[in-house]
Amino acid sequence: MKSCEVNFDGLVGPTHNYGGLSYGNVASQSNSQQSANPREAALQGLAKMKALMDLGFTQGVLAPQERPDVSGLRRLGFTGSDEQVIEKAARQDMPLLVASCSASSMWVANAATVSPSADTADGRVHFTAANLNCKYHRSIEHPTTTRVLGAMFADAKHFAHHPALPAVAQFGDEGAANHTRFCRDYGEAGVEFFVFGRSAFDTRYPAPQKYPARQTLEASRAVARLHGLSEAGVVYSQQNPAVIDQGVFHNDVIAVGNGEVLFYHQDAFLNTDPMLNELRDKLGRVGGQLRAICVPRAEVSVQDAVRSYLFNSQLLSRPDGSMLLIVPQECQANASVWAYLQRLIADDSPVAEVKVFDLKQSMQNGGGPACLRLRVALNDTELAAVNPGVIMTAPLYETLTQWVDRHYRDRMSESDLADPRLLSECRTALDELTQILKLGAVYPFQLN
């Protein structure tokens, strides 16, 4: 049976703004309080989805969250009608309202960790929604994420859904942004690679000093247990605390993997050689051969990697066995990064081509191509069981671009978030979206 890896990209929500909410994410903080363009952001994301579909890749779409999060504001003590709740929050605690309007769910690499059926004990695809407990604006996402994923992957014969881990620092979980799977073929057993920033309970592991390490070893181990992964099919590796302190808040900012290839910066990991040996050995036992591409710090600094989001790229397998690297245009604008990429494709490397995309609206908020997608490896039977409404087609692309043009504003600043009309605009848009994507009732306003 054939298998493929499907990229489900996050659709940017109508409240996209530059709130500067993510301490440790350099781009997010440096662009704080600039005016954003939600319409342009959503269209840029859709253009990437359409382009990959046109290249022959199976492409899906993941719906945004309901924002402003009125129910969350009510839990924090604001009362009255929905409009009054927003008005009071704007008057009494504007930073909280900004957090409650975040469109950060667009970065669906943080939505969940996914293990394909070839790796799991029960032969189903497993999903665990990430608790994202490091930041309030992201910690409120997982209940809706769980419902949306449940509506997309509804057949319990093929798909298993786990609730988020306990929302405490010891089990901080950031989803697939710290998880990669290596395999010879998507339908064969592989090795799942979990990267953590610190250990909650074992003081032998170092930790960053400036910025928080968002993923714990304990969370990664818990997800592996929930998914029924064997020890022989899992490798845990610690991210270098020094690069976290330079703005590498997730592993997908400093490394990317696909198939048998790990593309990483020289400073990405602690204890790199033992990690590579374990990965090479375990992948070899399931018929694979690891190809590690190390980018030397002498050619690309960590600072340039973070500025350009070189590693927050998509590494995609083409039918001929070569790979395509999808990068943001910031890579082209960075001389050392672009020079390195030209050498990479000229050398005898698996990466045969680099394609550049304009994702400026997302990039300025701290998310590149890899942040915007959740990878799900599926065989033909499982793919047929996915809700067909979320698989990108030319007609769906046209429908969604028209939907964005109808409902999204072209400017969003902090003061706009207090506009009581924004709530009704967003709910009208999302109600229509659930019909377009055939999701049913997934949003709080639809369930109440």
Curated annotation (Swiss-Prot):
HAMAP family: AstB. Substrate binds at residues 19-28, 110, 137-138, 214, 252, 365. Homodimer. Keywords: Arginine metabolism, Hydrolase. SUPFAM superfamilies: Pentein. This is N-succinylarginine dihydrolase. GO terms for biological process: arginine catabolic process to glutamate; arginine catabolic process to succinate. It catalyses: N(2)-succinyl-L-arginine + 2 H2O + 2 H(+) = N(2)-succinyl-L-ornithine + 2 NH4(+) + CO2. The active site is at residues 174, 250, 371. It is an enzyme of class 3 (hydrolase). GO terms for molecular function: N-succinylarginine dihydrolase activity. It comes from Pseudomonas syringae pv. syringae (strain B728a). It holds the Pfam family AstB. Its EC number is 3.5.3.23. The keyword Lyase does not apply. Pathway: Amino-acid degradation; L-arginine degradation via AST pathway; L-glutamate and succinate from L-arginine: step 2/5.
